[in-house]
């Protein structure tokens, strides 16, 4: 009878979700929430589920819920049946770090679109049912740090799209099934009660993924030389050893007598690999809270930012920049700020101003975090990298793909539009340089690191003198203006044209002369009417006949780097001049 009721419920649930709407999704989540006493979410019937519900994301059409992120909200008890499972378009579900109890929800089989499931750090228990073959789109499954027991279900082999599997720190027992998961790149079965050997299909993973179990090492069949059987090979090897020892003994006794052989053991220094960027055990720093922009909320928490695998992109005067992959496999840039000289209130005010800037050519500030020990700014990630990397990386190498003139013109156009948007709000950037200009998918330049100079300690005078990007007046005042931004942007234009780094370098120094930056070098060359010699050979070697356009851009760049700031154009004028060279939008 119980089995009949179970299958009847599943069929009924399937009928209900087959014609579901956003309103039905909303009712399902309200039903879910009604089982708990949580005041943190602020969900209600009258509010807009797609834009104001904490942790909820809708699809582009705004007609279905596709993501529910509710980590560490404080839920207690069972996951209410037939609530979340009614979200038939759900792709991402994170309920980690709560206090859920009971079995794995059997009705999750209805979540056919689910790609990411995070239930780690709860108190779920019992055996896992053989239901995973129904979730064929699942890419990430994390059930670690619970109390699941029994055997690991063989139905996991049906998850042919699975890339990450984490079942660590449970009480699974028995042997590890031979899981044939072609796309699996990460697995963790450590700290369970598993026995037997690691199956052949999983032997490509590191042993640490299986530590803390009662596994025995699989004996590998060793091949012997010349195709001999192992017994024959051992007999021949033994005979050879006897002959060698006998011969050596005879030589030592008859010819050399007793000799001493001394040796020395060399100790090898062991060095541990560089540690990952990890968070503290708690994130309860005074007032620490992530603030999101754009009507979005609860997209990630501090643990996501600090505990995820992070790749260092660079270190600069304002701090260290990391590339962080989130649990939903999206990527953001996290800048860990140092030398912040303003208090919380001024920091938050500045971040709010930056967060209101919305433009396709300005890197979006997604969120920020302020506490006594950490100040973080979270930005969009551009997978094409920065202009500095593209322009100067691997220069001279055979596999380098040079930037053509069309690409450089798009970069200049996009960056000018971004800076014009910033200046439009009477705002100052203060640190324009090629490493702060990123390339979008269409190769337009996008301005990053907006507004950080106003909350950071002033750059030292030596940095201003040697960077090559800063206007002459910055050396004395160390205060940025919109005209100093224009100067820095002009240097970027010259950098695009010449392919040379603005920082003082030997190739820009005349024989017996003093060091000069890029702008000074170009002024000296143009004064001698050798204009053609400044252009990057990577552009000149390409066909197209763009020399006239390049000369126009050179004149714009030189106007921007005028020594007197009152002689420099406004960025809006610069943008118009660049767009007048040639329209790149229609290409």
From Swiss-Prot:
PTM sites of type Phosphoserine: 309, 386
Location of Phosphothreonine modifications: 462-463, 466, 477
Residues that carry a glycan: 37, 44, 149, 169, 188, 214
Membrane topology, Extracellular segments: 20-232
SUPFAM superfamilies, alphabetized: L domain-like, Protein kinase-like (PK-like)
Signal peptide coordinates: 1-19
Record note on domains: The protein kinase domain is predicted to be catalytically inactive.
Keyword Phosphoprotein: yes
Record topological domains on the Cytoplasmic side: 254-587
Entries under PANTHER family matching the protein: OS05G0588300 PROTEIN (PTHR48010), PROTEIN KINASE DOMAIN-CONTAINING PROTEIN (PTHR48010:SF48)
Keywords: ATP-binding, Cell membrane, Glycoprotein, Leucine-rich repeat, Membrane, Nucleotide-binding, Phosphoprotein, Repeat, Signal, Transmembrane, Transmembrane helix
Transmembrane segments: 233-253
Source organism: Arabidopsis thaliana (Mouse-ear cress)
Domain Protein kinase: 307-581
Name of the molecule in the record: Putative inactive receptor-like protein kinase At1g64210
Residues engaged in binding ATP: 313-321, 335
InterPro entries: At_inactive_RLKs, Kinase-like_dom_sf, Leu-rich_rpt, Leu-rich_rpt_typical-subtyp, LRR_dom_sf, LRR_N_plant-typ, Prot_kinase_dom, Protein_kinase_ATP_BS
Swiss-Prot/TrEMBL LRR repeat ranges: 89-112, 113-136, 137-160, 161-183, 184-205
GO molecular function: ATP binding; identical protein binding; protein kinase activity
Pfam families in the cross-refs: LRR_1 (PF00560), LRR_8 (PF13855), LRRNT_2 (PF08263), Pkinase (PF00069)
